Amino acid sequence: MKAFRFLFFLFLMVALSFTGCHSPKTAPKEAFFTWEDSYHRPITLAEAPQRIVSISPAITEVMFLVGAQDKLVGVSDFCKYPPETEKITKVGGMHNINFEVLLSLHPDVVLIGSMISQQDVDAIEKMGIPVVCIVEESSLEGMAEMMEVVGKITQCEGKGDAEAALWRDKIAERKAHAPAPENRKCVYYVVGFGDGGDFTAPKNTHIQEIIELAGARNAGDSLTGWNISREYLFKVDPDIILVRREDSAAFVSRHPYTQLNAVKGGRVYGIESGWIDVVSLRNMNAVDYIAEICKTSRTTKTTKE
């Protein structure tokens, strides 16, 4: 009888041991966020980030838009809007990141745009911090995708998707009301002027997209670079000139710009640099401002090369 009991317990222990070795394994936890970023790199965030550094003015604005500003622990020196960004720790410029400050913030992820070098991306990742690049591929159109992606990363997906849909509707509405190409006024945006040379936005830039969405023609639409000659400027002889508000008085009083018909006719308008110089949610303000100027400007000339 004792031998039987011993064999029974031995059999039971072996069976339990065998069962334990083949117990079902716990399924691996699904990653919070997976995506191929704008640098075509596979991105995986295991957990929802709670501490985020943004080195892109556009991304920073979008985080405020979707209601995720409380997760921002650091921004670049160029992130100046909305005004609340003044209270957020600065981590340097887009070309001179202060890695020591950035590391001290213990971010879960760093969000970047198109102006960060691959060298800086590598340096951040070597510190063990994930980097996600979200480039607004075509400026205004690309802003909608940025809203969606930032919404997902910050757990504000519903708000991000809603704002993206609204943004696309705004673009479609303005395109629908734009005049025919032959009726568009030629607009010259002064990026730079004076002794250092003349500069304007060439084709395939977000500034050209802003001007065209406003129903106008970009004076630099045939250029591939930002610098232009005086001969080119006077040949184009733009209907309307836009210049940063703080530079408008100097521009209209400086020779030889005083000889341009737009200057003579009082068709030089100051514009907020934050609306047009960088890709931003405020680009739509520039679109509407330029569209209104084109509607109310007295000139009917449309100069073509």
Residue ranges and their predicted role:
Residues 2-6, 18-58, 153, 157-188, ...:
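Bacterial Sec-exported substrate-binding components of ABC uptake systems
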Residues 6-14:
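Sec-dependent N-terminal signal peptides
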Residues 36-40, 91-100, 137, 223-231:
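Short helix-initiation/N-cap motifs at beta->coil->alpha
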Residues 51-105, 109-115, 219-222:
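A short, structured surface patch at a secondary-structure boundary
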Residues 78-81, 164, 198-226:
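Alpha-helical, coiled-coil/dimerization segments enriched in small aliphatic residues
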Residues 99-106, 127, 229-237:
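Short helices/loops that flank or line small-molecule/ion binding pockets
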Residues 119, 136-148, 183-206:
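Extracytoplasmic ligand-binding site segments that recognize negatively charged/polar headgroups
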Residues 142-152, 161-165, 172, 178, ...:
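Structured C-terminal subdomain patch of bacterial secreted/periplasmic proteins
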